[in-house]
A protein has these predicted regions:
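Non-catalytic cap/lid and distal C-terminal segments of serine-dependent acyl enzymes
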Residues: 2-191
Length: 191
């Protein structure tokens, strides 16, 4: 994402290797922010939609492990090693832990998370899937609100935070939010 792909895209698709955006949904939300922490010239815009923004905190490693297992039998420790190590990749890949660098980089950020309360966008959803989508979004909201508060306390002023009164862990909400974010993203990266 940060070396081979940008060079290939520039050579073959005329896509510049700097001043790009990273947008992540769900577990990829924290990754989009971390990409901008460590590669600020490449990713001047980062967005997390319903992301887990403090994955090294408390019980989040266990929840990430459960999610990864459900998504294909993967194990979180195989990704970032044991959480007990204070220098672990869990900390290096945690937006909350790295919030001061994100602020120092002046990355434009857009953070979205619903409350877990369904709306018309959930009409026709399967009951079991809806219950899981409600649970995940409600669970995730706390880290997003805490991230906003810590970002502002660290002096961050280049962010949009959208926490509407409803929204589940569902593509319909993310699609709507992407459309709302699009003008801001285009203005930032000049496309």
């Amino acid at each position: 994402l940060t070396q081979e792909l940008p060079a290939w895209l520039q050579a073959n698709r005329d896509v510049r290797p700097t001043n790009n955006a990273a947008v992540g949904l769900s577990m990829a939300g924290s990754a989009s922010l971390i990409l901008s922490v460590y590669h600020p010239n490449q990713f001047t815009y980062a967005s997390s939609m319903s992301g887990f923004l403090n994955p090294s905190e408390g019980w989040w490693p266990m929840l990430v492990n459960i999610s990864m297992g459900d998504a294909g039998g993967f194990k979180a420790n195989d990704m970032w090693g044991p959480t007990e190590d204070p220098n672990s990749a869990w900390k290096r890949n945690d937006p909350m832990v790295n919030i001061n660098q994100l602020v120092a980089n002046n990355t434009r950020i857009w953070i979205y998370c619903g409350t877990g309360t369904p709306s018309e966008l959930d009409a026709g959803a399967d009951g079991g899937n809806l219950m899981a989508a409600q649970f995940l979004e409600g669970l995730t909201l706390r880290t997003n609100v805490t991230f906003r508060d810590n970002y502002i306390a660290a002096g961050g002023t280049n962010g949009v935070f959208n926490f509407p009164d409803n929204g589940t862990h569902n593509w319909a909400y993310w699609g709507r939010e992407l459309q709302a974010m699009k003008p801001d993203l285009q203005a930032q990266i000049g496309r």
